[in-house]
Amino acid sequence: IQAKLSFVLGIDYANDNIHNRIDGACARYLNMRKKMNTMPYALFVHGDSSENIKDNTGIYTERGKSVINSVFGIGEQNEEKLGKGVFRQYGKGVDGFNICSCQFAIHYFFESKNKVHQFLKNVTETTKVGGYFIGTSYDGLTLFNELRNKKQGESLYIYKNDNKIWEIVKQYSHEEFKS
C-alpha cells in the first residue's frame, strides 16, 4: 500500500487462503478497500506456482485461467465477458511486473528440482526486465532450535480462536543444524 502499487495479482495453492469468507485474501482485500481508497486493484487466483503460470498449467479453475490470460494480454478484451475488475487489468503483465514476490512459501518448491526450476521459470517469465523479485522464508536455525525438544512428528502451532492458523511439523531426526 505504501509502495503505491497500482495492481496486485495473487496466486495461492490453498483455495481457502483466497476464498475464505472471513479471512481469505479476497475478504481481507475487500474489507481494506472499503477503509482505504489507496488500496491497489487486486485479482486472486487458485493455482500452483511450481507449475507454469503463463500457459495456465498451474491455474486450477477456468475463471482463474481467464484472469491470467487477461492479465497477460491473451484472448479477447471484452468487458462484458471478463467483468469490470478483470477487464481493467487487461494486459498489465504483458511485459512482466515491476515486482514479483513469494512470501513464506518458497520452501514448498524445494520438494523437487523440477518444482524449484519451474518456480524460477515463473519468476523470470513474470518479472519485468529490471524488475525485482522479493522472497521471504523462515529462519531455519531459529525453527530448528524451536523444534529441538520436539520428537519427530510433533509440531509447533498457533491457534486463533479455535482455528489452527499455523503449524510446523518436525519431520527429521537430526540433532545439529547444518546450513
Protein language model annotation of sequence segments:
Residues T136, G140-S179:
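SAM-dependent methyltransferase
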Residues I1-F7:
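Conserved SAM-binding loop of SAM-dependent methyltransferases across substrates and taxa
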Residues S101:
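A conserved beta-strand element that flanks and buttresses the S-adenosyl-L-methionine
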Residues N20-D95:
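S-adenosyl-L-methionine
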Residues F7-N15, H46:
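Conserved SAM-binding motif I beta-strand of class I
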Residues N17, N52-K54, Y108-F110, L141-N145:
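Short catalytic/ligand-binding loop motif for oxyanion handling, primarily in non-cytosolic enzymes
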Residues A14, G24, D139:
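Residues in the short beta-alpha loop(s) of Rossmann-like NAD(P)-binding domains
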Residues Y90-G96, H107, K113-Y132:
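A short glycine-rich, Lys/Arg-flanked "PGG" loop and its adjoining helix->strand segment in the class I
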